[in-house]
């Protein structure tokens, strides 16, 4: 039985890992052994941060809504409680966008919430 030479498969595997390490700094981009570890770690960070991204954006939306509603004389918690009471079902992403790009519409929602809370 002939001897199996692994040159082609090894080269392909190395090329794949080094392609994934493109843009890394130092030896992480061109030394296979180090690049392999760097690519694995990058994958772990990417996996973790895809989940964290959702939490980060929710915090951003809440901070924006809080700032906008406070400027109109209402705290975030009272604003959200008033939305629930008034049966206004708008999610935080849309409220945040509205507070930045359409302050008049956001102000009218705050007025409805204030009327509901009064």
Curated annotation (Swiss-Prot):
The keyword GTP-binding does not apply. The keyword Ligase does not apply. One of its GO terms (biological process) is translation. CDD domains: Ribosomal_L20. InterPro entries: Ribosomal_bL20 (IPR005813), RIBOSOMAL_L20_CS (IPR049946), Ribosomal_protein_bL20_C (IPR035566). It comes from the Bacteria. GO terms for molecular function: rRNA binding; structural constituent of ribosome. Keywords: Ribonucleoprotein, Ribosomal protein, RNA-binding, rRNA-binding. One of its GO terms (cellular component) is ribonucleoprotein complex. Binds directly to 23S ribosomal RNA and is necessary for the in vitro assembly process of the 50S ribosomal subunit. It is not involved in the protein synthesizing functions of that subunit. Belongs to the bacterial ribosomal protein bL20 family. This is Large ribosomal subunit protein bL20. The lineage of its organism: Bacteria, Pseudomonadati, Pseudomonadota, Betaproteobacteria, Burkholderiales.
């Amino acid at each position: 039985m002939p001897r199996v030479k692994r040159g082609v498969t090894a080269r392909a595997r190395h090329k794949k890992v080094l392609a994934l390490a493109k843009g890394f700094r130092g030896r992480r981009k061109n030394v296979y052994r180090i690049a392999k570890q760097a690519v694995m770690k990058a994958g772990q960070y990417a996996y973790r941060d895809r989940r964290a991204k959702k939490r980060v954006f929710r915090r951003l939306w809440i901070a924006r809504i809080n700032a906008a509603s406070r400027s109109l004389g209402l705290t975030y918690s009272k604003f959200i409680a008033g939305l629930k009471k008034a049966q206004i079902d708008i999610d935080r992403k849309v409220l945040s966008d509205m507070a930045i790009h359409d302050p008049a519409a956001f102000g009218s929602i705050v007025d409805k919430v204030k009327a509901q809370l009064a």
